[in-house]
Amino acid sequence: MVRLREIPRTATFAWSPGPTQPLIATGTKAGAVDADFSNDTQLELWELKLDDAEQGVELQPVATVSVDSRFNDIAWSQPSEQHPRGIIAGALDSGALVLWDAEKLRTGASDAQIDQIDKHTGPIQAIQFNPFRPNILASAGAKGELFVHDLDDESKSFRLGKAGANPDEYTTLDWNKKVAHILATGSSGGFVTVWDVKGKKENLTLNHFGRKTVSAVSWDPDVPTRLVTAIPTDQNPLVLAHDQGVLSLSWCPQDSDILLSCGKDNRTIAWNPHSGEQLGRISGRDKLDLPDQIQPVEPEPYSRPASFDGKIAVQTLQNTGANADQSKTAKQAPEGEDFFAQTHAEPQGASFSLKSPPKWLKRRAGVAFGFGGKLVRFGVVDAKSKITISTFAVDSDISQASEDFDKALETGDLTSILESKISKAATDEEKADWTVIETLTSDNPRTKLVEYLGFADQSEEAPAEVKKEAQTNGDADEGSSFFDNATDEGNFLSDLAARKGAKTNNPFQVYTGSESEADTKITRALMLGNFDAALDVCLKENRLSDAFMIAICGGEKCVAKAQAAYFKRQSDAPNYLRLLASVVGKNLWDFVYNADLKDWKEVMATICTFADQAEFPDLCEALGDRLEEAIAEGTTSYRKDASFCYLAGSKLEKVVVNWAQELQENENAGLEQSETDNSFSIHARSLQDFIEKVTVFRKVTQFKDTEQSKENDWKLEPLYAKYVEYADIASAHGQLAIAEKYLDLLPQKYPAADVARNRVKQATRKGAAPAAAGQRQSQPAAAQRGQRVVPAYGAPAPQPTPAQRTASPYAPANPLAPAQTNSPYAPVNPLSQQAQQATQQPPARAGGAYTPAGYQPAPVQQGYGGYGQQQQAPLAPPPQNFSNPNGPSIVPAANRGHIPAWNDTPDFGPPKTASRRGTPLNAVASPFPNQQQNYGPPGGASPGFPPQSRPTPPPPPKGPPQGPPRMTSPPSQAGGAPPNAPNPYAPSPAANNYAPPPSGFAPPQQAPVQRGASPYQPPQSAAPPSNRYAPAPGSQPSAPSGMGGMPPPRNIAPPPGQFTPGASAYAPSPYAQSPAQQAPAAVAPPPRGPPQGPPRAGPPPGGPPQGGPPRPESRPGTGQSQPAAPAAARYPPGDREHIPMVSRPIYEILGAEIQRVKAKAPAQYKAHVTDTEKRLNILFDHLNNEDLLKPDTIQQMNELASNIQAKQFDEAIAIFQDLMTNKNDEGSNWLVSDVITFDADVGVKRLIQFSKSTPA
């Protein structure tokens, strides 16, 4: 409890009601003596000024009125129209009841006193206003006098009870807080009486105290039949925890679970009256406390009762810290004083804070929006707290429209949809679009398109036959045809004989002698059937009519030649010949590109009539593009026409751009015209029309998106953006299935859909069955985690019992051996500073599927050379399930959906501690006592599996192995692989961008141990590490390069109590830290084949036989003595839902920036931008898992992202350089490149460079 204010008075008091600034009215207490022995009696007002920081603790009165008698009680009524601050009533010791107007009293008006009522014949002990009717005031006092006053009309006041019937004095009273006409009183005779004021009668009398005075009575604020009483008797104070009598009670009107009691033992105690729990207490140094009160409007401050030391303290119920005087310790009493006098100087402080918030701080009701259109509400229903989840729609019309459209699509009745849309179209452009789409549903769309353009095939009526007058004498009319007067019988052709033996009376000569040379050539060519030559002569002589007749006989080739020659000669011919030339030559592109745009309908009709089916879409697109170019020049009326061409050619990627512009225009028009709808509703409806149009068009044309697998440069990107927006609106209205349907139409690599797609999938994901969940809970945690690490590509290997060893063959002999291995799975530098802080990174499969995260496989070696093999108990060989070397490769576990939790971190049960048999100490030259030299491989190696260089595991225990096997191996090739055989899982050294830097980055080294050259060993690329636990050289036979071994187990920290290895399971890199800082070892894979040569040294007698994984054993003298904590659960790579809010600006700003750069970067930088994006995804994965990055690093990254967003690249570079200098251990994968051969930095640095170079 915190003391807020103090009033230096020994007085009775009352709080001001109402929402105004709190005031306290005090009246000099009857029977109390001031420190100055003053006889003055005053009514004073005090303003707390809790919002004034300059106000001191001790207050000064704002108004003072002198009274002729002292006060026993004060009451303050609710505000009213006549009295805006209420009425203050004073119960005087003289028996007078005085009323003041609080507002006039505060302003110092002379007429502040309203009235004085003198009905009591003795002192008035208690008064109180009715909480429901502020004009009703009850007063009780000596001689059993109890009056109910109507301040509006004093003539209606009356007395309860008969005069002389109760000689006791009323000491306290309280109105019921639920029933307006119920009043309770307490008397000096020990009686508690419940009165029915409406009936003016006594309802109930209680007496459980004998003749003990009732000091306080208070009704429960919530329950109308419950009240609490107290007596001031020291022998039985009734309210427990008080050592002496209780003087007053105050039940909080806002929270019935808080009750204050004040006693003569100088303590104020807070209670929960319903549970009987004591919430806390305040102990004071005061001699005697008087009644306390909780403020009726804002219960947090309450008045600690006035005491006879002359103070009224205003305190809070909740403690926020000790006061300055409470923090002081008691000072040593001066010499000669009473030792026990120190106790009076002990600080008295608050001894509690409320365990639960009071009701006025609790939320009685609350509401929150949830994803998927969910509205979560909680509140009190039928006296119980209830949570309700309902679906909320911002605009019910929008959700109803989307549902109706989705149902119509499911029925497949597109005709009814089209008819409805055409009839409801608001603009001509929209109606034209739907009409064109409707024409595409017909059996012959081209014919319908021609009809829509207004070029229906209407055969002209034959002209009426004109009767010609017979010509008389004279020649025929000039220009008349020779055949005009001919009859059918006189037809020249009909006179020719058509059958064998027929003779006519019209003989002719083949050559008359008057023929020209051309005629002769033509005749000769026709006789010989050489139509091509005859055609050439006709064309040369410009006899086009004869040429066409001959071409008809000569076939298509001749016809084409005649047509070409004809059109060539008609340069000044009518325009229809240009059209005819395009049609005949099947070259409609000339007509499309060169025809005047005002005749676009004619061009479109020609395309629909003559275009080849394969060229038709492209011709329509070309015509639409010409119309679009005209729009760009300012002729906007062509947009509808261009959309028609795109629709006819099924070019969705082109028409969707026009529809998007139309969408924006419709939205702007709706905002101008509508007076009731909000902008969201108008936008959502316009978007709904857009989506319906696109969806129906795709259904009608059976459109197939061929760019689903592309990573960028999508033609339909404007449509994808609308799909994402529509999915968000559908999700907000609870239509998750509809949202998911449209999100599935987007490419998987479309970045803007990642968040929406993940949220929808999580919201629609079904939970596990209750039975399965219960079964999982019943399993031990270790068993559950152990089962997850068993891969599906092979059965678990049998778990043999390791034999007891006689000597320790596991200690390395050479402290300076470099860490190189020929195994494509053995990672290099697993325990560098970067790797130690990133042990929980997700695997980065740059090359092999089994490459552990954070490690780069070493370059393929030609042999083991001088790098020795630590002798140990090997793992059991994998099951003999060999596959054809040329057969299909093993499907990675990441691509197998049926493997449950395949990527979870393994866990192992607690090991049994094996007793270590004492071994004699050997005299050795090694710097480590009792260290045995390394030998060759154990004699019991499985045939067909070459030995693999691997680090030293801890020695096995003597007992049987515990827990499930750590890892089983995949099926290997029968008989082993030939020398130099490529390993399908081993990445090449240059294929991994995450390889550690070569020797140029190595820290200062110790001098390496000189050793003989090995025919199998390549030259060293760096100095050996200064690690005394590195494996010894020259103790392992060589193996051919490219021989793959089992994938190593994931480098994880074991659970507590697992084991304490003495050295790393992987050979340390040249820049590894000391063994005391290295992570716990993991078991190395088993050998994969026989040795490729004689061993340098035979195995020691009694060496460990072949068996299962060696069990760890506690060994003193190593740097690691405490087991590491189990690895925390990680989210899958690419998940961005768990990025905390403090890190989300980094993801949002950098992600948006890389997408901007990616869209505008030149093609030659595509690979660099892609690599930068991959590095940033590593950063985002760490942010999502809340690992690796420290809070100060995240803060710096936020500043860096803000600088990039603000185009302040110099500041961003400065922050980046600081991170590279001081935080390189946290950002080696995403800040810059680890491979020097690339000769370029990537990650954040390259993003800054790209952003600086890419225009906005």
Swiss-Prot record:
It is a peripheral membrane protein. Residues 765-809, 833-862, 969-978, 1023-1041, 1061-1082, 1123-1132 have a biased composition (Low complexity). InterPro entries: SEC31-like (IPR040251), WD40/YVTN_repeat-like_dom_sf (IPR015943), WD40_repeat_dom_sf (IPR036322), WD40_rpt (IPR001680). Component of the coat protein complex II (COPII) which promotes the formation of transport vesicles from the endoplasmic reticulum (ER). The coat has two main functions, the physical deformation of the endoplasmic reticulum membrane into vesicles and the selection of cargo molecules. The COPII coat is composed of at least 5 proteins: the SEC23/24 complex, the SEC13/31 complex, and the protein SAR1. SEC13 and SEC31 make a 2:2 tetramer that forms the edge element of the COPII outer coat. The tetramer self-assembles in multiple copies to form the complete polyhedral cage. Interacts (via WD 7) with SEC13. PANTHER family: SEC31-RELATED PROTEIN, SECRETORY 31, ISOFORM D. This is Protein transport protein SEC31. It comes from Phaeosphaeria nodorum (strain SN15 / ATCC MYA-4574 / FGSC 10173). The gene is SEC31.
